[in-house]
């Protein structure tokens, strides 16, 4: 029997509790990083999810997580789910997951389409302990996941050529941890890295396939808009 792609209860791995100290969180990252799969090719997906979190300055201690689902290849938006709530974990560089992931997982529990690929606004393995938010969530989802960050967290690189599609390696102490990808002519590049169950080559391919004339790929662009609109009080249609 074919899998139900309209399952009202989309499940994920519940790997651990979120009530941790900063030291415990770092130890957990070091352990979970060993489980990330950096290989894999994504078959033609039907649904691609985008994930982003907005934490407005004026709403300290609050955040909004958005999970959107787009149907490929047209990249039509078919579902938007948002959750607003408290962010309990303090801001600590490298521990973004522990601030944002609990809200993301609450939003994910509401979706009715089963994604074949996730694109997360944030780092995958391009992280000091090789477990940024995209890699961490990729283990929860057990599905191909890509980290698509707007800025660099660690590593060094040579600026890619100015035309869309060009990229260079992101290196950290000689290890290749991602790619610096130009997604639009003459605009700042994005920092792409493996989240889980995908190769960096395939990650670059799918990011470019999801771009439609903007710097951000459509899944995270829609997720960014959804989280921002929710915070400003705009009405969002949830399908």
Segments from the language model and where they lie:
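C-terminal binding/interaction regions
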Residues: 9-36, 101, 106-107, 150-151, ...
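A short acidic-Thr-Gly-centered motif at the start of a beta-strand
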Residues: 35-44
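Short hydrophobic alpha-helical runs that function as membrane-insertion/retention elements
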Residues: 144-149
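Catalytic-site beta-strand/loop segments enriched in glycine and acidic/polar residues
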Residues: 105-135, 141-143
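Two-metal-ion RNase H-like nuclease active-site motif
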Residues: 46-56
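Short, well-ordered, mixed-charge alpha-helical segments that flank or form enzyme active sites
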Residues: 58, 126-129, 153-157
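A glycine-rich, hydrophobic loop/mini-helix early in the fold
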Residues: 57-114
């Amino acid at each position: 029997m074919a899998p139900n792609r309209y399952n009202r209860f989309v499940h994920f791995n519940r790997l651990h509790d979120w009530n941790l100290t900063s030291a415990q969180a770092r130890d957990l990252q070091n352990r979970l990083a060993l489980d990330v799969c950096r290989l894999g090719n994504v078959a033609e997906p039907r649904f691609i999810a985008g994930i982003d979190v907005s934490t407005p300055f004026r709403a300290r201690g609050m955040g909004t997580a958005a999970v959107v689902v787009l149907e490929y290849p047209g990249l039509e938006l078919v579902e938007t789910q948002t959750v607003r709530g408290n962010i309990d974990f303090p801001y600590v560089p490298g521990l973004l997951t522990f601030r944002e992931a609990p809200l993301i997982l609450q939003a994910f529990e509401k979706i009715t389409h089963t994604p074949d690929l996730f694109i997360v606004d944030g780092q995958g393995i391009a992280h000091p302990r090789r477990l940024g938010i995209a890699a961490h969530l990729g283990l929860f989802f057990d599905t191909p996941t890509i980290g698509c960050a707007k800025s660099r967290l660690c590593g060094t690189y040579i600026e890619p050529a100015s035309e869309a599609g060009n990229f260079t390696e992101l290196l950290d102490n000689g290890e290749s941890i991602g790619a610096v990808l130009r997604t639009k002519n003459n605009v700042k590049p994005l920092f792409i890295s493996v989240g889980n169950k995908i190769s960096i080559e395939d990650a670059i391919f799918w990011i470019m396939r999801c771009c439609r004339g903007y710097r951000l790929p459509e899944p995270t662009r829609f997720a960014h808009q959804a989280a921002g609109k929710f915070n400003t009080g705009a009405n969002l249609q949830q399908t």
